Amino acid sequence: GHISHWHHELWANGYSSRPGRSLIPTLLGASQCAQGQPMPLAINPPLAAGGGSDRNAIPGYSFDNTHVVNHRLTVMPIRTSAMRALGAFANVFAIESFMDELAHASGQDPLQFRKLHMQDPRSLAVLNAVVDRSTWWHLPKAEGVGHGVAWARYKNTSAWCAVLARVQAGETLRVLQLDVAVDVGRVVDLDGVINQTEGGALQGMSWALKEAVQFDRTRITTQSWADYPILRFSEVPELKIHVLDQPEQPSLGAGESVQGPVAAALSNALFDALEVRVRNLPLSQDHILQALNAPN
């Protein structure tokens, strides 16, 4: 089977309230003065300019019918701002996790199911490259070990990225290996591309496994590193970056293509290991236990 209709809705604020983009003061402190200016609405640029919350909400697949709706929220008790990759992180996580769910629901291999819906040759090339160059993807898996795959083209106009994840899953998730393939067009600085991709992959892994800002109806309640854990050096997996040089193609940015695919690949690997789907980030012990104990 194949997908005939795809419907995606999201609800989000704008992402940028930085100083210098408004006719009135936008420093947070200015809104707290006795006669200060109210904070302006955060900017959310149109998708044609790269988008904000809706970045990568349009899937990179060829479906017969695609319907994407972005609901712009204008009221929030706390200020929102930019995050690396903006909405691409959440949207790619959602799209690639659900593609995995659909593959399993239809009894198809997740990798082949993706290829069934792909027509862009460079998308196929980056996905094939990460699989072909991986030394572990086709190896037998021990109990509790899972493999996951995800990919995206950043902004649907920039760099291509595909990720394979190998995890050991139980009440907690341990990442054993990550393989990443990227196509940034003509490579000007190979070390720079590798460094950006490695750093982005580890940051995406930290977001996916650990990071969460807590808040109530009026304020952020997360106060320190004690209640905002991040990835530690001891948790860094074996990480391999495979760069596809395209010397005849324009160069593309390398810094924000990998975060979303990493999160989705980890989620899909967790499902492969435990056969339970964790749909809420981070993929923490609490969320894994909730999924394991949820009624079928």
Locations of regions flagged by a protein language model:
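Cofactor-binding beta-sheet edge motifs in enzyme active sites
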Residues: 2-296
